[in-house]
A protein has these predicted regions:
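RNase H catalytic domain
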Residues: 15-19, 62-131, 144-146
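Glycine-rich, phosphate-binding/catalytic loops in enzymes
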Residues: 27-28, 93-96, 135
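Generic hydrophobic secondary-structure packing signal
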Residues: 52, 56-60, 128, 132-135
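Charged phosphate-binding loop/patch that engages nucleotide di/tri-phosphates or the phosphate backbone
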Residues: 133, 137-149
Length: 149
């Protein structure tokens, strides 16, 4: 569908409201045209619940990576929680079941140069990050399920 693009930009974020968490992502072309969004509310799991919005951001990054792999082939994951990239690159150690699962899922895509990472400061008006933040919040408020799996 978007294979003609050299890459896409995927902004990801997570949110937590009253102990429930969710994630969202927004896909942009290299010239910043919004082409796809998705979001989903998280499952009720003690470890994931304790990780709060980080669980949503991990989930959004994994879903965005699947979208990138299927629809374009290369993308940059823009994130405001630095651990998303530090775990995958090995700069930070994982010590929880779900962060290890996240790394096991993401590292092959990173190693094959399908994805790369770019940190952005949250809540500073970066459009893609604000859209992803809104999507993550809406996933909880409206009990949304991921469209693309």
């Amino acid at each position: 569908m978007y294979k003609h693009l050299d890459y896409v930009k995927a902004y990801v974020d997570g949110s937590v409201i009253n102990g429930k968490w969710g994630g969202g992502y927004a896909i942009y072309t290299p010239d910043d045209k919004l082409i796809y969004t998705d979001c989903g509310m998280g499952i009720n799991n003690e470890e994931l619940n304790a990780m709060r919005n980080i669980s949503g951001e991990m989930s959004a990054a994994m879903h965005a990576t699947l979208w990138i792999d299927k629809n374009c082939g290369r993308g940059i994951i823009y994130h405001d929680y630095i651990g998303l990239s530090k775990w995958v690159t090995g700069e930070w150690k994982t010590n929880k079941t779900y962060t290890k699962m996240y790394v096991d899922f993401m590292r092959p895509f990173w190693t094959l140069d399908i994805i790369s990472f770019q940190w952005v400061k949250g809540h500073t008006g970066v459009e893609g990050n604000e859209v992803a933040d809104d999507l993550a919040r809406d996933s909880i408020i409206f009990h949304k399920e991921w469209k693309f799996n």
